[in-house]
Curated annotation (Swiss-Prot):
Keywords: Antibiotic, Antimicrobial, Disulfide bond, Secreted, Signal. Residues 1-29 form the signal peptide. GO terms for molecular function: lipopolysaccharide binding. The lineage of its organism: Eukaryota, Metazoa, Chordata, Craniata, Vertebrata. One of its GO terms (cellular component) is extracellular space. The gene is PMAP36. Its main location: secreted. This is Antibacterial peptide PMAP-36. Residues 30-129 form a propeptide. It is found in: Secreted. Belongs to the cathelicidin family. It holds the Pfam family Cathelicidins. Transmembrane segments: none annotated.
Amino acid sequence: METQRASLCLGRWSLWLLLLGLVVPSASAQALSYREAVLRAVDRLNEQSSEANLYRLLELDQPPKADEDPGTPKPVSFTVKETVCPRPTWRPPELCDFKENGRVKQCVGTVTLNPSNDPLDINCDEIQSVGRFRRLRKKTRKRLKKIGKVLKWIPPIVGSIPLGCG
């Protein structure tokens, strides 16, 4: 009789814990904002860089139109600038001042808003002068338009691929 009561009580606690787990979303399961995803991409850029100083987000271009799926790659375009913080300190770049006459890079590619996925395909080119900057921005916008067009076609293509044996 005592074991039945203990088992029933344990079952109730298990049910409560299960319901609590379903109701309270975990922090890792929540989608990132567009800006947060770009900041993660900048962090990744700093991790993979062999340069002496950290880079920090200087300018973020307009986000793409809203897409409900956080796992879908989103086209992104942003500019980073070299800071005064040396890379080995691993200080958060947001706390670092921009370096006077520091390098500026224009970055394009795709990111996902799903925090469990790493940023995808980010390429950065150093900006040399104002004239080149304008040309680079034009190229960047063209690349983003192409990426956006390709991403629009992915769901219909994937949906038309037969997955079963027959």
